[in-house]
Amino acid sequence: MNKVTLLHEGKAKKVWQTDNPDLIIQEFKDDATAFNNKKKGSIADKGVTNNAIASRLFTMLGENGIPTHFVGKLNDRDMLCKKLDILLIEVVTRNIAAGSLVRRYGFKEGTVLSKPIVELYLKNDELDDPLMNEDHAVALGLGTCEEVAHLKAMAKKINSLLVPWFAERKLRLVDFKLEFGRHKGEILLGDEISPDTCRFWDAESGEKLDKDRFRLDLGGVEDAYSEVKRRVLEQ
């Protein structure tokens, strides 16, 4: 499968059109950003690590009935995917209080939530990806009521699969962001699942093993990503 035209270059990936109009290639980069591109840097081999992690997780989710855009891992940095009409809705699922949930509502960091919280954000960097509800999403023309409800239901199902899967690998899934898109009339999970889009804490030590190490200048970013990769690829 060949890269024909660069369709889009984002913060973490390049998206290429292939010679098949229904398929694209996601090329994972080493670039790192935080706070909606206000902080920039690079993490050695991040693209290779995230491609490996996301490929494994998409495979697992597909085996458990979650429709995704994943077709296959082509090489260290490239992932073959179905071409999606991306929905401009970011779906964040939270199991443990951290990040903006702590800042907005006064939760103590590390509080285990009585039930997962599913939040919707408008995918718009210029507006700093504002939090919104289902009515906003429908009013903005981002999807129908049924589609937005379906996204939240899919996020809950994905969470129910990921939490125990990571727990077996001694990782706590604190929270994570999902993106979806339409492909031939079906809504599929897209983008990636990786330490760029999830918060992972070591189940025993509580050590942060995700992009918070970059955001908060904690150091050891490459080692944290590599450790998540090692555990994810364990059989």
From Swiss-Prot:
Keywords: ATP-binding, Ligase, Nucleotide-binding, Purine biosynthesis. Gene3D superfamilies: ATP-grasp fold, B domain, Phosphorylase Kinase, domain 1. Pfam families: SAICAR_synt. SUPFAM superfamilies: SAICAR synthase-like. Pathway: Purine metabolism; IMP biosynthesis via de novo pathway; 5-amino-1-(5-phospho-D-ribosyl)imidazole-4-carboxamide from 5-amino-1-(5-phospho-D-ribosyl)imidazole-4-carboxylate: step 1/2. InterPro entries: SAICAR_synt/ADE2_N (IPR028923), SAICAR_synt_PurC (IPR033934), SAICAR_synth (IPR001636), SAICAR_synthetase (IPR050089), SAICAR_synthetase_CS (IPR018236). It is an enzyme of class 6 (ligase). Belongs to the SAICAR synthetase family. This is Phosphoribosylaminoimidazole-succinocarboxamide synthase. It comes from Chlorobaculum tepidum (strain ATCC 49652 / DSM 12025 / NBRC 103806 / TLS). The lineage of its organism: Bacteria, Pseudomonadati, Chlorobiota, Chlorobiia, Chlorobiales.
